Amino acid sequence: MEIKNVCIIGGSGFVGQHIAHLLAAREIKVRILTRRREYAKSLLVLPTVDVIETNIHDPRELGQLLVGVDAVINLVGILDGDFISTHIELPRKIVGACEQNGVSRLLHMSALHASTNGTSAYLRSKGEGEKVIIESNLETTIFRPSVIFGPGDSFLNLFANLVKRLPVFPLGSPNAKFQPVFIEDVAEAIIASLSTPTTFGQSYNLCGPKIYSLRQLVEYVSTITKNKLSIIGLGDRLSYLQAMCLEFLPGKLMTRDNYLSMKMDSICDCNDESDLIKIFGICPTELEEVAPLYLVHNTPRGRYTGFRDRAGRKN
């Protein structure tokens, strides 16, 4: 199967922009569907990328914008809000639009441990969304990553910003486990599967090479950014109460449903060889290889260097 035109739904986000850049480098035409065109500023200069502002939840608009594409990648996901509309109804509309336009190839981003019996509404909705994809008549591939890190992420960068302001850090769910996976590894796996028939009808768990507790990740970020930090790990009850309080603050750093999601460790089965290696031949990138390169901008020296670079100074 030769893929020449790809539509990325939710392509203006962290993962979508990385995939779009890699596809553009391969001279594959990319159509980005997004709610806000300004979110994809870095893509506007790419000659093979077309950024279209649209209402992706409108079946008519969606159907019109899938005309002429060879494959669709759905990256739309939220951590808070209307999970049913975003994670279940939208995939159903995408499947319908693909069938309407003869687009047989559909790649779908889910989440590690997504299940109709999941510990949270988020994981259950992701599981229901997978069911919609699997039951379609399309050539589908589902990806279930752990937390994704890389330049521009909203995970390590969030902690980097918080530790600058909080010398004492009350950390909910400090023992929750994660297996962070590098954005470039995720993007390469998705692109590799586009035209690979052996990935049709399959689901892949994407994890990095190491497992960390949430406490270890926050401590690592504070070390890299040179911020002295005292972490107070909260037990289950206080973690839940913290999430409930944060849920009602602007920005929603945490919600009760996020807390419930973290009751299930975001790690791959330690008895299985990583799908990144086994299926895609990608050696998972260690967090320590990459994170310092972008977290350094959250240090006083790094911020000074960033300002100097933007001012065009070399010394």
PLM region descriptions:
Residues 154-155, 173-195, 201-205, 216:
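Substrate-positioning beta->alpha
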Residues 177-184, 204-224, 233-244, 283-286:
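Substrate-binding strand-loop-helix patch
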Residues 237-315:
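A hydrophobic C-terminal alpha-helical subdomain
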